[in-house]
Amino acid sequence: MGKKDIRRKEQREKKRIARERVETLFTLAERVFPYSPELANRYVEIALSVQQKAKIRMPRKWKRRYCKKCHSFLVPGVNARVRLRDKPYPHVVITCLNCGNIMRYPYLREKKARRKYASKSTENGNGPDWTS
């Protein structure tokens, strides 16, 4: 093995450790939030700094659980309001009740499911059946 391979392996290991740490910090934030929201917010800040330092992507399930503006851990019904909207496109609106920041996430699950169903049925030779 050359130096590049060793360095690449080390980088991969560092990123794996960083991913584990981010996951651990967010699960800790989730567990500790009912007792100490400030500590949960601190865990989120640490997780964000680890993620930025290691240059890894934040998993989607955690990306939507903190406010992008004030970096507080969001719990629907406690410090976040979650609403579903259809116009101009179907999306989820999450409002941080600490700072008032609004985040919008599109949801296209039904269309993707229909597309998958249509592609599977055309492979079988049946064609799309939208009657059911």
Swiss-Prot record:
GO-annotated cellular components: cytoplasm; ribonuclease P complex
Keyword Zinc found: yes
**Cofactor field:** Zn(2+)
Known Gene3D superfamilies for this protein?
6.20.50.20, Immunoglobulin FC, subunit C
User: What does the entry give for GO biological process?
Assistant: tRNA 5'-leader removal
Keywords in alphabetical order: Cytoplasm, Endonuclease, Hydrolase, Metal-binding, Nuclease, tRNA processing, Zinc
Q: EC number(s) of the enzyme?
A: 3.1.26.5
Database matches in HAMAP family: RNase_P_4 (MF_00757)
Q: Function of this protein?
A: Part of ribonuclease P, a protein complex that generates mature tRNA molecules by cleaving their 5'-ends.
For this entry, the protein name equals Ribonuclease P protein component 4
- Native source organism of the sequence: Thermococcus kodakarensis (strain ATCC BAA-918 / JCM 12380 / KOD1)
Q: Which gene encodes it?
A: rnp4
